[in-house]
Amino acid sequence: MTIRLNKVTRDLNVGIATVVEFLQKKGYTVEANPNTKITEEQYAMLVKEFSTDKNLRLESERFIQERQNKDRNKASVSIDGYDKKEPEKTVADDVIKTVIPEDVRPKFKPVGKIDLDKLNRKVEKEPVKEEPKPQPVAAEEKKVAEEVKPVVNEVKKEEVTVTPATSEPKPVKEEPKPVVVEKPVETEKKVVEEVKKEEPKVVVSPEKTEKKEEKPVAEAPVTPVEKEEEGVFKIRPTEFVSKINVIGQIDLAALNQSTRPKKKSKEEKRKEREEKEKLRQDQKKQMKEAIIKEIRKEDSKQAKVVGKENLDPNGKKKRNRINNNKEKVDVNNVASNFAHPTPNSERTNNNRGGNQQGGGGQNRNRNNNNKDRFKKPVVKQEVSEEDVAKQVKETLARLTSKGKNKGAKYRKEKRDMASNRMQELEDQEMAESKVLKLTEFVTANELASMMNVSVNQVIGTCMSIGMMVSINQRLDAETINLVAEEFGFKTEYVSAEVAQAIVEEEDAPEDLEHRAPIVTVMGHVDHGKTSLLDYIRKANVIAGEAGGITQHIGAYHVTLEDGRKITFLDTPGHEAFTAMRARGAKVTDIAIIIVAADDDVMPQTKEAINHAAAAGVPIVFAINKIDKPHANPEKIKETLAQMNYLVEEWGGKYQSQDISAKKGLGVPELMEKVLLEAEMLDLKANPNRNATGSIIESTLDKGRGYVATVLVSNGTLKVGDIVLAGTSYGRVKAMFNERNQRVAQAGPSEPVLILGLNGAPAAGDTFHVIETDQEAREIANKREQLQREQGLRTQKLLTLDEVGRRIALGNFQELNVIVKGDVDGSIEALSDSLIKLSTEQIQVNVIHKAVGQISESDVTLAAASDAIIIGFQVRPSASARKFAEQEGVDIRLYSVIYAAIEEVKAAMEGMLAPEVKEVVTATIEVREVFHITKVGTVAGAVVKEGKVKRSDKARLIRDGIVIFSGSINALKRFKDDVKEVGTNFECGISLVNYNDLKVGDMIETYEEVEVKQTL
């Protein structure tokens, strides 16, 4: 089953370009067309990759649905709550007007609930009894109150539960209050009796029931309450109408304080709203000046306020409307889009229709009613008799939102202001800088998105310079520069490493602790770097190195006698390891430059000084071998002074120390100076965080897999951490120190050997501890992809120009080399040295380089590409050796880098065609010419100089011009054939295929000698 691309993008909440790019990475070519169909397998891959986007989309839809449901529930709940509290307001209004006499009189017939109402009122009216107009009645009321007090609470409860019923019971409640005071004693007695009858049913602990107001919604108690209330009405209003007014005023004030004021003064509320809105207008006008985006919102709110002002003066409606439309039509549209898109857009359309259809008063009214959204409550109040529920919902929502969200709304506006300001600042910075930070081979689509232009414009620009590019084609640096310049951008290239770097966390100053300094020992070959470390470590390091030369960067953690710690990096000295030395200077804090006192400041020493200076590393000079008889430390200091490196003894800023690494002279003083420099630097690190640091070396160990020497620069590296270094990653399975002792963790400035990486990272790569294995894998894969693409792009392909150059040279040769070594740094150094050997005639190509022993796959590659295999401190496996013998592949093994370079150079010289030189052997003068039948012309001649041989070649010279070149046919002395004739001897000589010899000609004989070419 196939699925269309547009359905996939909707389901997974991603763009078509993203889907197409992902499938292309997986090896599927898919057209970027919404109607393109993909297979189930491809769909499954997409679901696996982009399931998070899909889940986010579903989650957001679910959240929106829940919020809509909540809004609906709130609306219905607010109505119920409103009915419980608010109907008293509307009832009060009705009672005041005229509804009382019509509804109350028919309900007067049954006598029953008078007492309940009385009780309610009496409990509240106990203070009112201070006005003793009818004295006897007051005394009786007290008795009734004492008897029925426990029931009063419950009656209130029942009334609350009854609230969902119509507003009729509530007028009943309000009238009985005044009547209760002056009822005849007989009716009161009857009521008391009825109440007593009902008491056993309802009388429970009143305090408990008060808490559970909403639960007892029994129908049985409701009906008797209604009957009793009806009875109350009958008796009271007819007999005492005048006195109702006096007592009723007190009750209304006491009961309806919380609810009445809201509905009593709707006009006052409007005035208050208008005043508040005017205040908001003033605030918003100030905001306008600061923020452009706020203007639309403020204008829309101003428009609403202006509309309300226009409602009152009818005469000015027309003029105001015209002015408002001129100024604020767009603002209303914008506001409608921002606030309530669907309903308001419809209303704005209706408004337009009303305005356009005619100029009568009806149209004016329509326009004014619909113009302002906040006036809808007013319209609904007019129709409130028809649709009470909607009015309640709208009014309550408006009132509650004003009470609750007033502060929240203000805070939100402040937040919006701040965020908008920040956004504008960012936009300005972007506009000012216009610098694109990118890697070299980005796609046309990515470049377009970075410049915020359409990809079609980028493709069009490329076509205008004669390049046909597709949307996902990667562009080289030159093209990117051209396109970016066309759109007014500058480009700044960052490597793939930088682009994919992990965000560094900044450490708080209180978390930092002092760490040991990392000291690099640099200098020329055999000037005593390792001997110095040897003395400091009290161990013979040199014994393990081939030829006594340090091949790898050694990292050592040393604890001095006073307990202070220093980490040393011992870098190789000879020029092949320039890259390694540069890397060592990058991770170091202090550099010790060693110079032998019996030698001079060598080129490698100068290079080491330059590396340290370029890295901004403090330098301490150690002048070694002062115990030798011919040592001259002052000469070294003089040479350094000529290089602008004045030591402290000569008034400069660089510390120096005369030492003897073998005997230990001056070494403690040197350590003091190093530690002094370290104190000046105030080196600190945070051990309580994920580790970061540098890869010093990496190698493939047959028993342990890929092993990397790392130097922790910050944090603490523990066994079990997930480490990402370059394109390699893995979980740390074990850690060892430089003495091969297992350790559990390594803090800042500690070098350790780690096991568990899935490859050999390049020496000098930075490593980071990542939280999850998945994240590390993703970053490593992306880096590897960029590295591979970079390699493919930079691979020099054979062009016609190159072919022409080779033909012109005539004898062009290529030497393909495969380099295998024990550690990454040595492989890199050897490869660079071999590539430097290339000349115009012979090009050296390192087609493959890797860590580990020579395998069968290396031999296969060498056989296919006519390459030789160079192994540096590694050996081929048994199967690889046999395979190489069968295929005739040359495997050369070395343990010292110089030997490898020299032999390759010799092999290259052997590949060159030997140069042919002519060596003149003799000069012969022709004295006589003899014409002999069947033989030809023979010259009688004398050898003027040299020795002529029978095998030599000859050329005939007449008057200084070469007439003929050929070989000697016969050489005779008297009648005998001879092999050679010496100087001043006569001889007979004839030339092959040439008879025009004349007296006085000169014959020059020569031989061709092949001279071996050198590079």
From Swiss-Prot:
List of residues binding GTP: 523-530, 570-574, 624-627
Subcellular location as annotated: Cytoplasm
Biased composition (Basic and acidic residues): 196-217, 265-315
Region of interest (G4), ranges: 624-627
Domain of life the protein comes from: Bacteria
InterPro entries on file: EF-G-like_DII (IPR053905), IF2_II (IPR044145), IF2_N (IPR006847), P-loop_NTPase (IPR027417), Small_GTP-bd (IPR005225), T_Tr_GTP-bd_dom (IPR000795), TF_IF2_bacterial-like (IPR000178), TIF_IF2 (IPR015760)
Region (G2): 548-552
Positions of region (G5): 660-662
Segments of this protein annotated with the region G1: 523-530
Pfam family, one: IF2_N
Residue intervals of the tr-type G domain: 514-684
Cited NCBIfam families: IF-2, small_GTP
HAMAP family hit by this protein: IF_2_B (MF_00100_B)
Protein function: One of the essential components for the initiation of protein synthesis. Protects formylmethionyl-tRNA from spontaneous hydrolysis and promotes its binding to the 30S ribosomal subunits. Also involved in the hydrolysis of GTP during the formation of the 70S ribosomal complex.
Xref: PANTHER family: TR-TYPE G DOMAIN-CONTAINING PROTEIN, TRANSLATION INITIATION FACTOR IF-2-RELATED
Family label: Belongs to the TRAFAC class translation factor GTPase superfamily. Classic translation factor GTPase family. IF-2 subfamily.
Protein name, per record: Translation initiation factor IF-2
Species, as recorded: Bacteroides fragilis (strain ATCC 25285 / DSM 2151 / CCUG 4856 / JCM 11019 / LMG 10263 / NCTC 9343 / Onslow / VPI 2553 / EN-2)
The gene coding this protein: infB
